[in-house]
């Protein structure tokens, strides 16, 4: 990765790859080293969703951080994102990560850790509305670029489970039938989940 970074000095991809690989080390990497890699990435592409996502995973409780550290990073990134940037959806990625960690740790898949309210508590609902406002509202072009599919699926999944049809319906219409495997697979069979919510909200092609 470092050789690629030297060969392609303006390309953020090698730095994204370095951060992705860093979380696979049993003890992670030194904070200063991660910070240097992040500075290199951020300087080349300050609004890279994939780059931010790799850091978010690194900071998650599943890897080398905590839920608090992960959410702080996601909300800080969302807070400085320009209107129309997809970075606010990092908060929905963080909520999925928290759910996965809690579900794996729970002996009783719902009652022991309150997973039934994970998607629809006040904080989760507010987060969905905030991402919707900052990212989607105001878009004049409702076409979906291939690189946006996964991010839109994360927001649609969150809106569905939060019980926000005013957000979920337009998102499902934008997606049409282009459901991605994740995050739907974390709450059931992905195809069945995507189809179920389209039917529940009466979204037609």
Model segments located where?
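Short coil/turn linkers that connect adjacent helices within long alpha-helical scaffolds
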Residues: 5, 42, 141-143, 182-184
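Extended, charged low-complexity segments
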Residues: 145, 149-150, 154-205
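Short, low-complexity intrinsically disordered segments
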Residues: 13, 117, 130-133, 182, ...
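Alpha-helical repeat scaffolds
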Residues: 1-3, 29-43, 65-81, 105-139, ...
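Structural motif corresponding to the intra-repeat A-B loop/turn of tetratricopeptide repeats
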Residues: 25-28, 64, 98, 162
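Amphipathic alpha-helical repeat scaffolds of TPR domains
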Residues: 7-21, 45-61, 79-117, 145-156
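Tryptophan-centered motif/residue detector
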Residues: 15, 38, 63, 182-187
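Small-side-chain structural scaffolding
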Residues: 4-5, 12-14, 162, 168
């Amino acid at each position: 990765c470092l050789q690629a970074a030297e060969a392609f000095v303006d390309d953020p991809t090698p730095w994204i790859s370095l951060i992705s690989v860093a979380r696979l080390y049993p003890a992670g990497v030194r904070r200063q080293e991660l910070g240097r890699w992040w500075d290199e990435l951020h300087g080349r592409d300050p609004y890279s969703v994939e780059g931010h996502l790799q850091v978010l995973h690194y900071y998650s409780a599943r890897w080398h951080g905590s839920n608090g550290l992960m959410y702080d990073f996601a909300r800080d990134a969302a807070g400085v994102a320009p209107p129309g940037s997809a970075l606010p959806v990092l908060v929905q990625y963080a909520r999925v990560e928290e759910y996965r960690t809690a579900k794996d740790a729970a002996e009783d898949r719902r009652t022991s850790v309150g997973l039934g309210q994970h998607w629809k508590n006040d904080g989760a609902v507010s987060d969905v509305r905030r991402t919707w406002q900052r990212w989607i509202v105001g878009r004049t072009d409702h076409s979906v670029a291939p690189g946006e599919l996964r991010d839109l699926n994360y927001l649609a999944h969150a809106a569905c489970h939060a019980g926000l049809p005013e957000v979920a319906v337009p998102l499902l219409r934008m997606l049409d039938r282009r459901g991605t495997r994740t995050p739907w697979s974390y709450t059931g069979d992905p195809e069945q989940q995507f189809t179920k919510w389209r039917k529940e909200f009466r979204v037609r092609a």
